[in-house]
Amino acid sequence: GKPVVGVVLIPVKNEIYYAVEGGGAFYESLNGENLKISASHKSEYNEMVMVKSRSHASEKLMKLIDKYKFKDVKDSGSSIKICLIARGLADIYFRFGNTNEWDICAAHCVLSEAGGKMTDCLGNTLIYNKVDPLNRNGFIASNNAIHSKFVEMAQETI
């Protein structure tokens, strides 16, 4: 299956991201900010912000960071990275290695509704609600401007 509703709550920041298939993606904060969000359209690496995991940095990822000169590389937690791309505050997130589908499903819906894209690292559509809930080929979340190029970049590291 595919995600059709997504809600990502970030209690420590008093923020929430949510989306329903066909209805757009939204961000709200406790201070009253309420925005319809969309991914950026940046396509030049030196203008893009990469987000990465504090706890899952890999040799593959470090090779990409060294080779491609992104504007900035920021650490962030879990599904928050995907939501930052959906909001246009970041542009690319590579996750090499296994992930559980429940860790990314809601954020995937938010990103898709914001105009971004997520695939596995081979460029295949992510499938949810499988017998085996593990995504064994990692994933790439992007602003979608040059997603196919990011898939090629991921292949360089394999």
Residues of each region from the PLM?
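Oxyanion/phosphate-interacting regions
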Residues: K63-K67, C83-I158
